């Protein structure tokens, strides 16, 4: 009787790969009034490190501007994780790397953005949850259309 190998999915390490904050118009920007317009961009990526180990990145860039002109701040965070995937079919592994891992990492990135912006003297930025499954499906459709 053959021994069936059990699938393995585990978090090996979570870490901040990159964190930057720019306040180009400080200190004058703190004296200005108005509601900032906040723009958020998110990207994900993964790479194979060695057999069974993958690095996944979630990069969040938040820009706040007054009157759609003067930048209050620009904050970029790359939250990363090393994940172990073994005995998992390639299609399922792609889904884990493109959806499950970013879902695990995003709350850490969101906290890093909020904490950094607050420590810079601005009100906290509360980022809404992201549907990484929808993003993954769009990427799959775009790749299929381009093939």
Swiss-Prot record:
Predominant subcellular localization, coarse grouping: cytoplasm
Gene Ontology CC entries for this record: cytoplasm
SUPFAM superfamilies the record matches: SecB-like
UniProt keyword annotations, A-Z: Chaperone, Cytoplasm, Protein transport, Translocation, Transport
GO molecular function per UniProt: unfolded protein binding
GO biological process: protein folding; protein tetramerization; protein transport
Pfam families, per the entry: SecB (PF02556)
Subcellular location: Cytoplasm
Task performed by this protein: One of the proteins required for the normal export of preproteins out of the cell cytoplasm. It is a molecular chaperone that binds to a subset of precursor proteins, maintaining them in a translocation-competent state. It also specifically binds to its receptor SecA.
Family to which the UniProt record says this protein belongs: Belongs to the SecB family.
Classification via HAMAP family: SecB (MF_00821)
Subunit structure: Homotetramer, a dimer of dimers. One homotetramer interacts with 1 SecA dimer.
Name under which the protein is recorded: Protein-export protein SecB
UniProt source species: Neisseria meningitidis serogroup A / serotype 4A (strain DSM 15465 / Z2491)
